[in-house]
């Protein structure tokens, strides 16, 4: 132990400094000393002394948190007796000290929960010593209110702790503990909690009694934790609860069939203080979401009836809903009425007509208060969206009344948004239109709601649009209109254009009629007429939000009415012809292109408009028939012949803008490339003509690089814009003839400029990232476009350039030294990731025979591979999996290397081989299925290589194995634990986890077993003996069947047989382990 911490008094002082001081250096010194204390051998004994004798709450907190760390560590865990003693000590300590600071009590309860969870399967004399949780807290529950609060907190924290996976322990162990806790304790805890709540609700709560309030709050938290439990291990994503079903076990049926459980929470809502009711509503949300299969039809109807009655009672007494938290939870509860029940079931509820009226009134009122709780409104719109979507399918004879109430909801949404515009402008409030994500989400919901009783929606939109458009036109004609009034009308029109786009996008082909298509035509005509008006004013003024709404409208219109699948006889086109003279799709496409060119001309410096305009162009260029119609338009030919900054300002060099703003240029040139390819064929003259602006830009850059004194910033911007343009063209050119023209254009003339830029600006990712991404595109053999003639050396020359760029960048980026964590990815790891992608694409493209490089003494392949190794070793293992793009590019490259270049892997230094094997081992348990599958493939290639080499070395005849093979075998024999660990990991995943890629996992497993027969036998015995005695024979038989008919080779036939056996094995093991209470603790080899 270091000198600074000699006594309890010193520890007390350090705790005070850590938690109270405002001086940073003092706090850091205290933190450092306390970290040393935590890691010291006497930490455990001194923690007990601190709890016994410490005079400050902070020292008690330190002791509790240190003990929690000690019991949580997976390496060198505390002995069982010691953990039992700590658990008992915590229970006694809290039982004798009810007046501790709340944060100390919470820390000790957390300690109890952690010990109990991690020791759940620990047994002593055939007794699971950590499972008697209700017995542990009974003495607290039978005492005063203060003690009862502590007892309930124990159960609440434990339920929460067991429900949460812990990154430091295997997911398999977490799920086994959670499942066992669910089956053996959770229902008893839930029942106890409900009973205590019933007792509490039966008494009149003293509003002044804080301890009673604490008890009620803890009971509600406990109940919510029980209902929120991840019963079947599927709730990994908590970011969305729209379609959440609570998978209540069948053994809990009695509690939900008893209507008093549901009634308890509705009664509590009406009887307890408002600050507790959000939790009550949260519990009701979970109860309303119980899985449908828990009930038969009659039981579900009865349950739903009680639920709807409770909702009705809240709506009839809405006073508490003025609280934002109550309001939010109640909106969630309403949404669950439709996400978990069918409209046909709802309409059969006795009070349905009254309830749907109350819900409609509540929704209308909520929407009218547009400034209030937009996140809660999401759930209301979700309810109405699902109700409206169900109308075509409902078969019940009872009226659903949605034809009455849905138009009211639509009208309320539309009119409230329009009315908000004036208030926002007048009071300088935050504009909802600034939150594009929220607006889009609401519009997606409205698109379905608005299509219900569409004639009413359309009539409303036409009336409001005509009104605003007429006022807007009059204001413009007056010439002296106040800017405020103009802004109001532009804001209203912005909302209307967004909403019109949404309801058109909500058209469903099988449910739409000619009349509805004609109504769409009415709306489209109005938007296009407005566009003509606003475009005519762009030289003087424009409104960015209105333009963005137009682009949103065009996108929806394109999806529904432009393309190969649309019936051209649509009544919409007839209406467009009558009003605007647009007779067919080609004429409508000319409107699209005209708008795109207008936007690029006037809004070239506005990134949001430019990027969305170019995305629209890109989407239009994908359709097979539409792209052929587009090419015939004079406006498109103009773009193909005049793609310069003179006509399109966003192609210019703007020193004020960010270089990342140039990304949209790639989208532009991808679209132009597709349009050019329609008629390009092998016309080199047409290609050269198209490339003239880029040729001029490259020649200009070449002159800059040749002169000693050039403007570096200007050169960078020119180059970045150019490579982004080229990447777009390269992406679009997926035919051999066009791609070969591009290749001949760029190589050898301009490739040296890219190499020179990497040398000069390797430290600037704004410059290197686009260049490396262009290289990745050029070497990508998409659609077999890189098929060089047999007499052409271009494949090898292209790889040489690739190798040169990777080597240049790799060697220089490694000179950057230590980088701050927050800049590491941007400055280094992103570039490394792209280099891995470049190398993978080049190695797997099948256009280079890599055997010739060594044959002719060409170092290009070796240089690239050695650079890969250097870059890899500069990246810590943890970073490989922490950054998804890096992990995906690394593991996909490694897959190619182990498949085609195993001799290179085998020739590496031992520490490099161990690094690669460790990365595969860690990747096997990655959450990303793509990474996990790649690791299985890598492991399979390595194991197959090992097996073949061992088989050859066992035979006397034939040539001796290469030197690198012998070295590799020697390294593997020196470190058998690495392959053995991977064998246990793969088997562990297949037996105990929800294995999503079973086929991939099966491929390396046979090789691993054949290479480690003795270890596999031990592992198998360990797994069998860890089962309860009555299950051991069945598990033994599973393993026997797994190896039934399997020979000692890795021939395809034998592998396929093993894969089939493994599928049966997994099914049999799962059946065998059902209802088993065995635990991982007796199976250390598996963890």
Curated annotation (Swiss-Prot):
Subcellular location: Cytoplasm; Nucleus
Listed GO CC annotations: cytoplasm; nuclear pore
Source superkingdom: Eukaryota
GO biological process: protein export from nucleus
Domain Importin N-terminal: 30-96
Keyword check for Transport: yes
InterPro entries linked to this entry: ARM-like, ARM-type_fold, Importin-beta_N, XPO4/7-like
Molecular function GO labels: nuclear export signal receptor activity; small GTPase binding
Record bears the keyword Cell membrane: no
Function: Mediates the nuclear export of proteins (cargos) with broad substrate specificity.
Family: Belongs to the exportin family.
Protein name, as recorded: Exportin-7-B
Name of the gene: xpo7-b
């Amino acid at each position: 132990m270091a000198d600074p911490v000699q006594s309890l008094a010193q520890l007390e002082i350090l705790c005070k400094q850590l938690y109270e001081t405002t001086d940073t250096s003092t706090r850091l010194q205290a933190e450092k000393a306390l970290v040393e204390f935590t890691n010291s051998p006497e930490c455990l004994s001194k923690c007990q002394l601190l709890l016994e004798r410490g005079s400050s709450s902070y020292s008690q907190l330190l002791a509790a948190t240190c003990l929690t760390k000690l019991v949580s560590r997976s390496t060198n865990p505390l002995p069982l007796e010691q953990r039992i003693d700590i658990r008992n000590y915590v229970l006694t300590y809290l039982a004798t000290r009810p007046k501790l600071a709340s944060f100390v009590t919470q820390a000790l309860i957390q300690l109890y929960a952690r010990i109990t969870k991690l020791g759940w399967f620990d047994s002593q004399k055939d007794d699971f010593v950590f499972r008697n949780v209700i017995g542990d807290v009974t003495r607290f529950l039978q005492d005063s209110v203060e003690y009862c609060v502590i007892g309930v907190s124990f159960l609440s924290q434990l339920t929460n702790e067991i429900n949460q996976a812990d990154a430091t322990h295997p997911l398999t162990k977490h799920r086994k503990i959670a499942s066992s806790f669910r089956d053996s304790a959770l229902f008893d805890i839930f029942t106890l909690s409900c009973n205590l709540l019933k007792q509490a609700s039966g008494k009149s709560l003293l509003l002044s009694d804080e301890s009673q309030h604490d008890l009620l709050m803890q009971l509600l938290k406990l109940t919510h934790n029980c209902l929120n439990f991840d019963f079947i291990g599927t709730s990994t994503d908590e970011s969305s609860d729209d379609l959440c079903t609570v998978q209540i076990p069948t053994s809990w049926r009695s509690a939900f069939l008893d209507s008093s459980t549901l009634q308890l929470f509705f009664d509590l809502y009406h009887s307890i203080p408002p600050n507790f009711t959000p939790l009550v509503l949260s519990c009701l949300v979970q109860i309303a979401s119980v899985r449908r299969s828990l009930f038969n039809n009659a039981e579900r109807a009865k349950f739903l009836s009680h639920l709807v009655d409770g909702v009705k009672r809240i709506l009839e007494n809405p006073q508490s809903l003025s609280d934002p938290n109550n309001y939010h939870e109640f909106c969630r509860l309403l949404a669950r009425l439709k996400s978990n029940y069918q409209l046909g079931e709802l309409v059969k509820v006795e009070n349905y007509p009254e309830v749907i009226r109350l819900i409609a009134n509540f929704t209308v009122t909520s929407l009218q208060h547009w400034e209030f709780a937009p996140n809660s409104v999401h759930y209301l719109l979700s309810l109405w969206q699902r109700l409206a979507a169900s109308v075509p399918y409902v078969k019940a004879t009872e009226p659903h009344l949605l034809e009455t109430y849905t138009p009211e909801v639509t009208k309320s949404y539309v009119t409230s948004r329009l009315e908000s515009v004036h208030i926002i402008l007048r009071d300088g409030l935050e504009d909802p239109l600034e939150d594009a994500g929220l607006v889009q989400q609401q519009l997606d919901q409205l698109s379905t709601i608005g299509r219900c009783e569409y004639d009413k929606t359309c009539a409303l939109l036409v009336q409001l649009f005509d009104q605003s458009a007429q006022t807007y036109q009059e204001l413009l004609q007056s010439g002296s209109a106040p800017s405020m009034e103009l802004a109001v009308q532009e804001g209203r029109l912005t909302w209307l254009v967004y909403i019109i786009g949404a309801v058109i996008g909500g058209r469903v082909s099988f449910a739409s009629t000619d009349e509805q298509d004609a109504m769409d035509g009415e709306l489209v005509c109005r938007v296009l007429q407005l566009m003509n008006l606003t475009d005519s004013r762009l030289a003087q003024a424009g409104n960015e939000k209105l333009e963005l709404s137009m682009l949103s409208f065009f996108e929806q219109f394109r999806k529904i009415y432009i393309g190969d699948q649309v019936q051209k006889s649509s009544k919409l086109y007839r209406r467009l012809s009558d009003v605007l003279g647009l007779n067919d799709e080609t004429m409508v496409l000319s409107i699209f292109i005209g708008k795109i060119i207008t936007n690029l001309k006037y809004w070239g410096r506005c990134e949001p408009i430019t990027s969305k305009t170019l995305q629209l162009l890109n989407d239009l260029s994908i359709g097979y028939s539409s792209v052929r119609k587009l090419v015939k338009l004079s406006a498109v030919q103009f773009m193909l012949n005049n793609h310069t900054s003179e006509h399109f300002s966003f192609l210019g060099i703007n020193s004020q803008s960010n270089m990342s703003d140039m990304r949209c240029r790639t989208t532009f040139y991808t679209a132009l490339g597709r349009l050019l390819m329609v008629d390009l064929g092998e016309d080199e003259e047409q290609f050269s003509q198209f490339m003239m602006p880029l040729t001029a830009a490259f020649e200009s850059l070449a002159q800059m690089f040749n002169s000693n004194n050039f403007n570096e910033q200007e050169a960078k911007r020119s180059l970045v814009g150019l490579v982004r343009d080229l990447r777009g063209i390269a992406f679009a050119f997926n035919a051999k003839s066009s791609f070969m023209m591009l290749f001949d254009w760029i190589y050898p003339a301009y490739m040296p400029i890219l190499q020179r830029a990497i040398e000069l600006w390797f430290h600037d990712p704004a410059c290197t990232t686009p260049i490396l991404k262009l290289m990745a595109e050029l070497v990508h053999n998409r659609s077999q476009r890189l098929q060089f003639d047999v007499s052409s050396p271009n494949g090898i020359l292209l790889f040489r350039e690739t190798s040169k760029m990777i080597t240049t960048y790799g060697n220089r980026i490694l000179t950057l030294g230590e980088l701050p964590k927050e800049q590491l990815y941007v400055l280094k790891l992103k570039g490394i990731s792209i280099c891995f992608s470049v190398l993978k694409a080049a190695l797997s493209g099948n256009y280079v025979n890599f055997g010739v490089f060594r044959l002719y003494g060409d170092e290009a392949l070796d240089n690239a591979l050695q650079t890969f190794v250097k870059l890899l070793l500069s990246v810590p293992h943890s970073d490989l999996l922490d950054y998804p793009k890096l992990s995906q590019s690394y593991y996909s490259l490694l897959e190619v290397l182990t498949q085609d270049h195993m001799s290179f892997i085998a020739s590496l230094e031992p520490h490099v081989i161990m690094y690669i094997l460790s990365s595969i081992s860690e990747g096997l348990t990655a959450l990303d299925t793509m990474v996990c599958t790649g690791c299985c493939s890598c492991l399979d290639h390595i194991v197959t290589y090992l097996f073949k080499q061992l088989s050859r070395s066992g035979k006397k005849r034939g040539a001796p194995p290469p030197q690198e093979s012998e070295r590799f075998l020697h390294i593997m024999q020196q470190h058998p634990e690495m392959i053995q660990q991977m064998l246990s990991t793969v088997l562990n995943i297949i037996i105990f986890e929800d294995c999503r890629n079973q086929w991939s996992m099966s491929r390396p497993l046979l090789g691993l077993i054949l290479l480690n027969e003795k270890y596999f036998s031990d592992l198998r015995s360990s797994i069998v003996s860890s089962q309860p005695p009555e299950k051991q024979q069945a598990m033994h038989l599973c393993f026997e069947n797994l190896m039934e008919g399997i020979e000692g080779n890795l021939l395809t036939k034998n592998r396929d047989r093993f894969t089939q056996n493994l599928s049966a094995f997994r099914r049999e093991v799962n059946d065998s382990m059902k209802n088993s209470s065995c635990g991982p603790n007796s199976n250390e080899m598996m963890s």
